[in-house]
Amino acid sequence: MRQLLGGVFSLRKIDMSWAKTLMLGVFDYYNMKTIEAHQILPDEAHWTIEIPDLSRPWSPELAPAWRWSYEPWTYPIPRDSVAVTNLDALRGKRITEVMRWEQDEWEMFAGAGPDVTEQERRVVPLGILLASDNSLGPVVNLQIGSGLWRDDVSEWHPWGTSQGVKR
């Protein structure tokens, strides 16, 4: 482990199933079938849902946020869609507010969006959030300018109503 500004980081050897996908061209360039590579891991306080365990062979169950690097895109929205989200959502807390602002842009927050500070905001591929939480499926059907809300235990509701949304 090594302490650097902003946290403690460690190294872990990665499985070849990840290396062949992430190390584009390295195997051809060096004319090798295997190359030892390591993942830089943050401490638990800085872990987020898109950080996979690269020491284990890739599978969509173990690394759902990376599914679209290996599988075809299955949603009726652009693959390069993004979401402005917050660190709480990226650390696994339940997303409770969603708005679709553009063809390929959403806001998705765990907690009240207006309470999210600029320092807590992140822009991430929407696929990361969709793959990490199956309950987010209805957000891909939102019309531009529409939103959904829920509390920690309820189903999705369109903004301005208390009736649930069909999945």
Residue ranges of model-derived segments:
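Acidic, proline/glycine-rich low-complexity IDRs
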Residues: 2-167
